[in-house]
Amino acid sequence: SRPPAKLDFIDHVVGNQPDGEMESVAKWYETILQFHRFWSVDDKQVHTEYSALRSIVMSNWEENIKLPINEPAPGKKKSQIEEYVEYYGGAGVQHIALNTQDIIKSVQNLQSRGVEFLQVPDSYYDILRQQLKLSKVKVSEDLDILQKLKILIDYDENGYLLQIFTKNMQ
């Protein structure tokens, strides 16, 4: 028998919308499902030199269901949201985030079940090790194991988050 995936719950489900449709989708969640705006950002808050996005996170009143809704904002190049909408011919689910208490075991078990994850270059971990030396954040997991499994570390002064992405599924 296969080992359990060891996934605890769905953290969030991200939906990408064409430009100009985010507000009407958010309104639908408010009106039909009685969700509320948990959080929102505009293109001044989420942007790079080349692209930007707007986002509204909708949640039920218990706040155990979170649905970020994204739409592109003008930029020098196409955003990942514009590319998604064009590629798939419209709105849809960009990703589903799953929570686990033991990402290392979950990734190992999912790999044994045939799940394929995105590759991360070793240079990412070389740079990360140097940056972590200068940070107050102390990662308790073994960096060599995280590197072997291609688990990413996102951190700031308040702590860190471990994450990994599967290859695209259709």
Positions of the model-derived regions?
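Glyoxalase I/VOC metalloenzyme domain signal
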Residues: S1-F38, H47-Q170
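Active-site and NAD+-binding cores of ADP-ribose-processing enzymes
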Residues: D42
